[in-house]
């Protein structure tokens, strides 16, 4: 291998786009037969085991759009802002309610999104 230092590698990675980084991670996972998500799952499972089985608390929540209500356009705008979906996709999500808007998020974020959607006139639940 040439004279490539760790600093050179870090600098190279720092200049990559998000798409390039994603592709790099996938290639590294394939080359070494590992998954970047595995350590996170193991740490979460380990943390739950340390806390004990007595009080098992839900850590991931789903925000479900139950109904759009009377202010459908406002709800579509909020769904677009929250999810980053295009107009067509956001309208389809609102039309097909009940549908999840966001899944697997922390409670604080779920409550914030619920409040945003309710302010726009939607009926929302957090599960």
Swiss-Prot record:
CDD domains: Ribosomal_L7_L12. It holds the Pfam family Ribosomal_L12. Keywords: Ribonucleoprotein, Ribosomal protein. GO terms for biological process: translation. One of its GO terms (cellular component) is cytosolic large ribosomal subunit. One of its GO terms (molecular function) is mRNA binding. Homodimer. Part of the ribosomal stalk of the 50S ribosomal subunit. Forms a multimeric L10(L12)X complex, where L10 forms an elongated spine to which 2 to 4 L12 dimers bind in a sequential fashion. Binds GTP-bound translation factors. Forms part of the ribosomal stalk which helps the ribosome interact with GTP-bound translation factors. Is thus essential for accurate translation. HAMAP family: Ribosomal_bL12. Belongs to the bacterial ribosomal protein bL12 family. This is Large ribosomal subunit protein bL12.
